[in-house]
């Protein structure tokens, strides 16, 4: 019996949360009847007019779903931000929404001016002590289950793993909780818990990313390494020590980011700012190191065409000469050293000024 009560309590809570975030789209029953709204307080319910009276065609039709959406947006945003949520009512203009709001305000003021009796008022129910005790018990049970799951997640996070979830929690407080997306605000100050399936999915993504990175760094060095015939026949020592430097990792990231859609950390930072609509000072320092900023620019340049740059005649002649020299030596092919060595000056040669490059990237 207690388990069934707890299950229904959780279902009721989840339903309230779904209605709060999704509003009229959550599938709850319609609470309003369709009607025709007119600026002169013509507010007739559909089907309630007398058979002999012709219904006026003047007015705006509001169905139940539109009314549910209207009142939900009014409670979440306010009427002063109607331009932000008007897209949720595609069949209504801003003036029609404001007209409906003013009509409701006049009806509310008129109702306050009259002495209202008890007729038609909803019945007030008083909760018994037994019901209050039951609700308190159910809420404490749900809280205990939630805290137990959080403790298990903390214990798993303290052990050594692929992902540092403590860093994720710190980022949530500093970054994600300040999102300006109206549909998900207000966000809690504490990081949302991750399920076990979500954790496993994230770890698989990290493993695939690391495998791709090792393929471009360690495997390339191992393939070009030569060993003696005696060492090749020996089966006692199976490991082959390989040193991977930071420069090799940076070159691999740049190469893979240009050849295919490999997400690098600086690019993920920018995508996060756009996805969560976060404000950040443009004159501030977005990346910690200069290498991360260069890596971001390289990844962006690989996904776009070259920015238009105004050049004079001397620069054009110089570039034509360089292109001719490159055409003469192109038949020899690119050597392995040229592919490994990424010259940053060549990547930014088309941008004469830093302001032009940044202005082009911000489009």
Curated annotation (Swiss-Prot):
One of its GO terms (molecular function) is RNA polymerase I general transcription initiation factor activity. Residues 301-344 are annotated as: Disordered. Component of the UAF (upstream activation factor) complex which interacts with the upstream element of the RNA polymerase I promoter and forms a stable preinitiation complex. Together with SPT15/TBP UAF seems to stimulate basal transcription to a fully activated level. It is found in: Nucleus, Nucleolus. Component of the UAF (upstream activation factor) complex which consists of UAF30, RRN5, RRN9, RRN10, and histones H3 and H4. It comes from Saccharomyces cerevisiae (strain ATCC 204508 / S288c) (Baker's yeast). One of its GO terms (cellular component) is nucleolus. Residues 317-328 have a biased composition (Low complexity). Keywords: Nucleus, Transcription, Transcription regulation. One of its GO terms (biological process) is positive regulation of transcription by RNA polymerase I. It comes from the Eukaryota. Residues 302-313 have a biased composition (Basic and acidic residues). This is RNA polymerase I-specific transcription initiation factor RRN5. Residues 333-344 have a biased composition (Acidic residues). Its main location: nucleus.
